[in-house]
Amino acid sequence: MDWFVERREVSDVLHLRSGTRILPATFERGACVRKGPPSHGEYTWTELSRGTPAPGLLPSEVLERARAPLAESSRLSEGAALREDVVRRLVDVARSAGALHLEVTLREVDRWTLHAQPERMVEDRTRHALLEVKAFHGEAGGPRFDAWRCVTHPDATRLHAALPSLEAWVDTLVRELRETTPAVPCPDEALPVLFPPGAASACFFHEVCGHPLEGDVVARGGSFLARRLGQRVAEPFVHVSDDPTDAQGALGFTWDDEGHAARAVPLLRGGIVTSPMLDARSARALGLEPNGHGRRVDFRHPPLPRMAHTRVEPHEGDLASLLADVGHGLLVQHLTPRHMNLLSGDFSFHIVEARLVRDGRAGPRVGPGVLSGNGLTALAHIDAVGADARNLFATRGCRKLDHGPLPVSFGQPSVRFRELRVRPGT
């Protein structure tokens, strides 16, 4: 038997075409009780709107530890003015740089959990401030183009302290958008593809390496990588891991939602499929120990083996050096998932933002496209990994079954593939 108590507070500031909106803060508290073993236990959850559990829901010693996370007071109210100032100043910068419009989402989240078993109790507290911007450019009556970026900081105070660099970041985004549009058609061919540090690389490795090595998938032999544990699938310099403790202080956690210590799990080590991410249930099924990846969307959901901070380990060089050897290729800056077959490894992604590469230099943007292939072939085609890693947050979270969205993050350097298939999309 165990008990899980959660407190979550969320505050949002948006800037849309209609103006700036400050959304009412959300504040949730609840508890979940598991009776029976993790492999087939019964979970019962209760929302605690008033912060005080009904008599008998929690043992007295658990209730005493839960008083702090269940307290009524807001933990985000002191950052309200800072969040509004960040949004206002970035909108002003985008306007000065010539953007048609800048959409901004600034969300700060504070989460406090307590996991208790008869033999021990552990607490974990996380906070992050997520900034997402989308710049628009185009002439009146003509086509419009956009570019999206995001960044995460541990809280609104440190986000606000980084305003000078954030203003430069938005200014660069808008100017690059203006200089690289209008777009040319996406190629229809197999060609070298590069991912700069950021969204495209994060999306690719999350789908192609992460989900196939979640413990429940591995336990049922349900993925192309699960069937290849211990086998080489990429070059020796390709290392991919998932480490909940490493997220630049923004999204990391010390204990998972089952009370197990979070730790780094090597998914690919030296190009070899190495380890799955495990919760208690999948670990038991595989005859292994949990490794700190049992995560809940919230107190209403039981834990599942999930990714946290998926990273490609840095190797050597940077984007410029990886580009230098490419005569004709595609620099893909932003992907979104389209299709992923865990059994076969076949995948396809929407190309949201990309630029043609000619003679080692990034050129004009291309129109919408589709990147497709097979996971084993794509991993084998990685011929360079840079040392220029950057952290990124999945702004829409990660969904699995009916459990989502769950906050996840990434650490990604530049990555080059000898060849991937691309074609125009819609």
Please give the residue ranges for each predicted region.
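N-terminal small-residue-enriched
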Residues: M1-T426
